């Protein structure tokens, strides 16, 4: 599978059918799990899909997100190889419901308790529509029962493990409507899920309750509430800090203001694309979301349109 197609599967593969597609068509045998110590007892794991945070200590292990099912044993091995504990992963906290962050829920559910915000369970259980921002949407079938979180929360939840009061905080209407950032206060590390990414323009899943306004608000809330020297694990990309988040917010606000200005001038979406109104931020289009796709996402977010013009049913 070509890289662009793989990334689109990683970010937009939602629930059971899309996960099966990804697992059958990508060779996960070649994926290696890279482990980086972040701070305290928190580590960052990179493989395929979203970044994983892991708190590893004498009480056991809690991980944030779990990538894809075929990687579950590799993730377990990477954690065991740290030599800190032989205890299993006790808890998995999902930052949101997309398949590249929840794809390992089924194998991890055998020994772990899955935790997520209320809307994550709802969307996994019912199946959802997702649009990339290029006018296409996908309707996914419900996830298997084993993939569903068995503990859910509305606004926040705390897990007391390894000397940490690990806090999951709901950030509504950002990347999706079920987003949560996970803060490890003693280690001074936060996992921000896909509300903050380092691959270029972000994917905002409007069809799943996300919005550019909510993403900006969530990132600003994180900066206001977190310690200034906190280490930031993004949903995708390199380990970061709050200055990186500030630059990200600056890009989101600038692109949004450009679209708002064009809307006030009664310009159509096609006119905005032809005029390349996001050209000043072109350096941010290095990922799989190009400037036209991100422009359409902002336009749809501001005007209340869905991201998809048609649905592809699996």
What are these regions (language model features)?
Residues 52, 72-76, 86, 105, ...:
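Extracytoplasmic/secreted envelope proteins and their assembly/folding machinery
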Residues 33-81, 180-184, 189-194:
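Conserved beta-strand hairpin/beta-sheet module of binuclear metal-dependent hydrolase folds
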Residues 1-11:
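Bacterial N-terminal signal peptides that target proteins for export
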Residues 60-62, 68-70, 158, 165, ...:
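Metallo-beta-lactamase
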Residues 23-29:
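Cleaved targeting-peptide boundary
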Residues 41, 55, 65, 79, ...:
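Divalent metal-coordination and catalytic microenvironments
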Residues 14, 18-23, 224-229, 238-314:
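Accessory terminal helices/loops
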Residues 28, 80-158, 177, 257:
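Active-site HxH/HxHxD metal-binding segment of metal-dependent hydrolases
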């Amino acid at each position: 599978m070509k890289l662009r197609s793989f990334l689109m599967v990683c970010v937009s593969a939602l629930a059971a059918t899309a996960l099966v597609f990804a697992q059958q068509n990508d060779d996960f045998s070649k994926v290696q799990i890279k482990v980086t110590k972040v701070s305290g007892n928190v580590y960052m794991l990179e493989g395929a899909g979203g970044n994983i945070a892991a708190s590893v200590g004498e009480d056991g292990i809690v991980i944030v997100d779990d990538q894809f099912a075929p990687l579950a044993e590799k993730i377990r091995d990477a954690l065991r190889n740290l030599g800190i504990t032989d205890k299993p992963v006790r808890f998995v906290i999902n930052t949101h419901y997309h398949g590249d962050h929840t794809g390992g829920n089924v194998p991890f559910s055998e020994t772990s308790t899955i935790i997520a915000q209320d809307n994550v369970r709802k969307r996994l259980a019912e199946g959802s529509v997702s649009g990339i921002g290029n006018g296409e949407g996908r309707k996914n079938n419900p996830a298997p029962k084993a993939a569903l979180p068995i503990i859910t929360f509305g606004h926040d939840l705390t897990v007391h493990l390894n000397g940490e009061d690990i806090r999951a905080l709901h950030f509504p209407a950002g990347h999706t409507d079920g987003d949560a950032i996970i803060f490890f206060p003693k280690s001074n590390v936060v996992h921000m899920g896909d509300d903050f990414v380092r691959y270029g323009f972000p994917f905002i899943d409007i069809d799943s309750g996300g919005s550019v306004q909510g993403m900006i608000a969530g990132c600003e809330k994180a900066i206001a509430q977190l310690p200034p020297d906190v280490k930031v694990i993004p949903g995708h990309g390199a380990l970061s800090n709050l200055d990186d988040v500030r630059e990200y917010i600056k890009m989101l606000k600038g692109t949004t203001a450009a679209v708002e200005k064009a809307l006030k001038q009664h310009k159509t979406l096609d006119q905005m694309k032809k005029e390349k109104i996001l050209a000043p931020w072109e350096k941010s289009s290095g990922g799989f979301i190009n400037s036209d796709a991100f422009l359409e996402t902002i336009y749809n977010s501001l005007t209340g349109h869905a991201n998809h013009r048609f649905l592809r049913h699996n």
